[in-house]
Design a protein with these regions (language model features):
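Peripheral docking tails and interdomain loops at the edges
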Residues: 74-115
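A short, acidic, amphipathic alpha-helical segment used as a generic capping/interface helix at domain edges
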Residues: 37-54, 71-72
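Histidine/acidic-residue-rich catalytic or RNA/ligand-binding cores of hydrolases
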Residues: 13, 71-74
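Residues that form generic nucleotide/phosphate-binding pockets
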Residues: 27-28, 49, 105, 112
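Conserved beta-strand positions
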Residues: 60-63
Length: 115
């Protein structure tokens, strides 16, 4: 749900009262992406989503080539566990090779949520 093309880019609309290029630059430079460091706004956004959607656990899926998200996963885990929620990080290249392993890890994670 919180991914590069997910809800995050829709949180703050483009300011239509500014010159268009300035407004677009402001919009894109304020998207809480892991390449923008420090990225405290993403942790705040995750914290708010946990409360808003009353989740029991968070699954973070990281594309293997996205090193900044991989590094940031430490902070995501910290944010989630500080709220007393379960956390699972899955790193994948979206190929079929790790399909079975991911399935097993998801099943185990869901079992822990049921307890």
């Amino acid at each position: 749900f919180d991914c590069c093309n997910g809800t995050r880019e829709k949180v703050e609309p483009v300011d239509e009262n500014m010159p268009i290029y300035d407004a677009l630059a402001k919009k894109y430079l304020n998207i809480n992406c892991s390449v923008m460091s420090p990225n405290n706004s993403r942790m705040q956004y995750i914290d708010e989503m946990i409360d808003e959607y009353q989740v029991d656990g968070v699954i973070e899926i990281i594309l293997q080539a996205c090193h900044t998200y991989n590094i940031e996963s430490h902070y995501v885990k910290q944010t989630v566990t500080n709220k007393g929620k379960s956390y699972l990080m899955i790193e994948t290249d979206y190929s079929q090779a790790d399909k079975g392993q991911i399935h097993t890890r998801l099943e185990a994670f869901l079992e822990t949520l049921e307890k």
